[in-house]
Each structure stands twice: as C-alpha cells, then as structure tokens.
Amino acid sequence: MNYIAAGIALCGSAIGAGIGNGMLMAKLIESIARQPELEGNLRTNMFISMALVEAMPIIVIAMSFVLINE
C-alpha cells in the first residue's frame, strides 16, 4: 500500500510541477512581449520561481522514500 501512495504522490507532484512550469513560461513570454526592456529582470525572476516550483517534486521524492521504507 505504501508503494501505491508513493507512486500517486510522485505522479501528482510531477503533474503539478509541469503545469506550474508551463504557466510560468507562458507568462514570461507574455511579459517579455509587453516590455522587452525588462527581459533580464524577468528571466532572473523566472529562474527563481522555477526553482521554487521544482522544489515540490524533490521534497515529494524524499517523502516517498520515507514512506516506502516504513
């Protein structure tokens, strides 16, 4: 049962991160199209935000290992 729970958690976090990254990139392109002079600042903020979005699957992987080893 723990394996199923870990698999569901991993799938959910991967789907959520994929959707989040897609929305983030769409808004970045939209923002650069509006104000091209802010491209450097927007790209920096995008990388920081993408790191925060990608942190969730990494945390879930660690939690899944704990769940499987119980």
Swiss-Prot record:
Site positions (Reversibly protonated during proton transport): 54
UniProt-listed Pfam families: ATP-synt_C
UniProt KW Disulfide bond keyword: no
Domain of life of the organism encoding this protein: Bacteria
Single annotated GO MF: proton-transporting ATP synthase activity, rotational mechanism
Transmembrane residue ranges: 4-24, 48-68
Subcellular localization: Cell membrane
Alphabetically ordered keywords of this record: ATP synthesis, Cell membrane, CF(0), Hydrogen ion transport, Ion transport, Lipid-binding, Membrane, Transmembrane, Transmembrane helix, Transport
Keyword Methyltransferase assigned: no
Membrane topology: Multi-pass membrane protein
Gene3D superfamilies, per the entry: F1F0 ATP synthase subunit C
GO cellular component: plasma membrane; proton-transporting ATP synthase complex; proton-transporting two-sector ATPase complex, proton-transporting domain
Subunit note: F-type ATPases have 2 components, F(1) - the catalytic core - and F(0) - the membrane proton channel. F(1) has five subunits: alpha(3), beta(3), gamma(1), delta(1), epsilon(1). F(0) has three main subunits: a(1), b(2) and c(10-14). The alpha and beta chains form an alternating ring which encloses part of the gamma chain. F(1) is attached to F(0) by a central stalk formed by the gamma and epsilon chains, while a peripheral stalk is formed by the delta and b chains.
Function, as annotated: F(1)F(0) ATP synthase produces ATP from ADP in the presence of a proton or sodium gradient. F-type ATPases consist of two structural domains, F(1) containing the extramembraneous catalytic core and F(0) containing the membrane proton channel, linked together by a central stalk and a peripheral stalk. During catalysis, ATP synthesis in the catalytic domain of F(1) is coupled via a rotary mechanism of the central stalk subunits to proton translocation.
Membership in a protein family: Belongs to the ATPase C chain family.
HAMAP family, alphabetized: ATP_synth_c_bact (MF_01396)
Protein name in the entry: ATP synthase subunit c
Taxonomic source organism: Oenococcus oeni (strain ATCC BAA-331 / PSU-1)
